[in-house]
């Protein structure tokens, strides 16, 4: 008689999936908000909108971590990529004025390693705590043959809410407005295909002291900074005209996404010092300065645009919240079809 087969024989371990859910429940519980109705494990997650909003607008975003995951696999460093995952989506919806409400994740692998997946999702919960949003659910997909052993992919989904009258669109930006930059925590989650190419070429000692008490490996894998709480405080105290999350495309390509067509962000390259990690990447990769600005955040993780009379107050408030603030330049009138970010 033909041997009876089970789902486990086919490569899917339901018990491992159940164990993962039990492992992550305490981490998810710490992220809960009063708007969340019920806990993990349902077919859907329920969230109500607070009555403090007169005309609530939901703002959604989704993203991944990109090829930074390849370094996580190679270096067996899975504890912070979850923070990256949350940061990429919550920082995106934040720029339109939204307070993140909840987050969901998708974790896909060929063979579920419970300890590894627990590390990843623990990081996701940490990111949600930093952002003040609830981790209300997710999907763990074990798909034999789809991914190499030890590898996985991640996607995240964030939803936030903003009062309709307070949606930030950038339409009120005018020449003379001030462009502020908030310091990044490193490369964040974009440009890693180039980072990996530079590492391959340079062959550095990744565990040698590099920047203070950090190794080069630590500096490269450092998680994306989450700007939610400081910027929500800023928006509550100072009129913000526009914000840009500096992700793929760097400073050059992301800043114009919030500018009116007739405006240019004129940025002074001397207004901040290129952090040591980016200096190393530029030198070891022989990367042109303009290519650096359109690939990496170069030490600026978020751009904030305010009226000139609000610049000092915004800088003081953000500094008090622990942010490193750089006065990058000014908005000016656009000439013809010139690029809307000029860095010189």
Curated annotation (Swiss-Prot):
**Alphabetized CDD domains for the sequence:** PurM
Question: What's the top EC group for this one?
Answer: ligase
**Gene Ontology cellular component terms for the protein in this record:** cytosol
Query: Which pathway does it operate in?
Result: Purine metabolism; IMP biosynthesis via de novo pathway; 5-amino-1-(5-phospho-D-ribosyl)imidazole from N(2)-formyl-N(1)-(5-phospho-D-ribosyl)glycinamide: step 2/2
Q: Which InterPro entries match?
A: PurM-like_C_dom, PurM-like_C_sf, PurM-like_N, PurM-like_N_sf, PurM_cligase
Q: Where in the cell is it found?
A: Cytoplasm
Which GO terms fall under molecular function for this chain's record?
ATP binding; phosphoribosylamine-glycine ligase activity; phosphoribosylformylglycinamidine cyclo-ligase activity
Among the GO biological process terms of this entry, one is:
'de novo' IMP biosynthetic process
The record's NCBIfam families line, in alphabetical order, gives: purM
How is this protein named in the record? Phosphoribosylformylglycinamidine cyclo-ligase
Q: What organism does the record attribute this protein to?
A: Laribacter hongkongensis (strain HLHK9)
């Amino acid at each position: 008689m033909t041997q009876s087969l089970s789902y486990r024989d086919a490569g899917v371990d339901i018990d491992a999936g159940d164990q993962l859910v039990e492992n992550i429940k305490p981490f998810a519980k710490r992220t809960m908000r009063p708007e969340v109705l019920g806990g993990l494990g349902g077919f859907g997650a329920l969230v109500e909108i607070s009555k403090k909003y007169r005309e609530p607008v939901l703002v959604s975003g989704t993203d991944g971590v990109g090829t930074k995951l390849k370094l996580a696999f190679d270096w067996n460093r899975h504890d912070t990529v979850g923070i990256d995952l949350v940061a990429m989506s919550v920082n995106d919806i934040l720029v339109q004025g939204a307070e993140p409400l909840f987050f969901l994740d998708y974790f896909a692998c060929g063979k579920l390693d419970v300890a590894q997946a627990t590390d990843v999702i623990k990081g996701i919960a940490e990111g949600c705590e930093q952002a003040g949003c609830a981790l209300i659910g997710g999907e763990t997909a074990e798909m034999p043959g789809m991914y190499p052993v030890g590898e996985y992919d991640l996607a995240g989904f964030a939803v936030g809410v903003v009062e309709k009258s307070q949606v930030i669109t950038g339409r009120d930006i005018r020449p003379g407005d001030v462009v502020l930059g908030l310091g990044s925590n490193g490369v964040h989650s974009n440009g890693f295909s180039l980072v990996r190419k530079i590492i391959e070429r340079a062959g550095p000692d990744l565990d040698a002291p590099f920047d203070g008490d950090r190794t080069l490996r630590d500096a490269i894998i450092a998680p994306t900074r989450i700007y939610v709480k400081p910027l929500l405080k800023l928006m509550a105290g100072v009129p913000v005209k526009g914000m840009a999350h500096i992700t793929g495309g760097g400073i050059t390509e992301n800043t114009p996404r919030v500018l009116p067509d007739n405006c240019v962000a004129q940025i002074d390259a001397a207004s901040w010092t290129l952090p040591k990690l980016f200096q190393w990447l530029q030198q070891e990769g022989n990367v042109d300065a303009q290519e650096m600005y359109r690939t990496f955040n170069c030490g600026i993780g978020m751009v904030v645009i305010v009226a000139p009379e609000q610049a000092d107050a915004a800088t003081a408030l953000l500094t008090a919240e622990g942010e490193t603030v750089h006065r990058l330049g000014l908005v000016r009138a656009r000439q013809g079809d010139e690029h809307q970010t000029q860095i010189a």
